[in-house]
Curated annotation (Swiss-Prot):
This is Prefoldin subunit beta. Keywords: Chaperone, Cytoplasm. Molecular chaperone capable of stabilizing a range of proteins. Seems to fulfill an ATP-independent, HSP70-like function in archaeal de novo protein folding. Belongs to the prefoldin subunit beta family. One of its GO terms (cellular component) is cytoplasm. One of its GO terms (molecular function) is protein folding chaperone.
């Protein structure tokens, strides 16, 4: 189906596919970061309800290491701050990829409507499904 498209249009389609894949990866990373952020915020709220002299353990890899309240609280605050920055960065990256995708899509539609007729893309011009 892409065989009868001009090479420039085929390149744009490949770029669109790459951008779509990138957008999916960024969205997945953002979702994971948001989940970790919610979990960390919940843990911080839980720490607020615990007395400072309560015996605590922190997960380090496969181990649970004894820690004190202040250290646990500080570590969680740092993690929340870091995750907030990560989510913000991924949101901006998601927007950039979306803008690139839309721009490339417009270029492709113009290319197909202006140059090569009968392309498979878009709800474009009249009679745009023929040979």
């Amino acid at each position: 189906m892409q065989g009868n498209l001009p090479p420039e249009a085929q390149e744009k389609i490949e770029e669109l596919q790459d951008l779509q894949e990138t957008a999916q990866q960024v969205a997945q990373q953002k979702q994971q970061a948001e989940t970790q952020l919610r979990e960390s915020e919940t843990a911080l709220e839980t720490l607020d309800d615990i007395e400072g002299d309560t015996q605590m353990y922190q997960e380090v890899g496969e181990l649970l290491i004894e820690t004190d309240y202040d250290e646990a609280y500080e570590n969680l605050e740092e993690k929340v701050d870091s995750l907030e920055v990560r989510v913000e960065t991924l949101t901006k990256q998601e927007e950039r990829v979306q803008d690139q995708f839309e721009g490339l899509q417009e270029e492709l539609q113009e290319m197909l409507q202006g140059g090569a007729g009968g392309g498979p893309m878009g709800p474009g011009g009249p009679g745009a499904g023929g040979a």
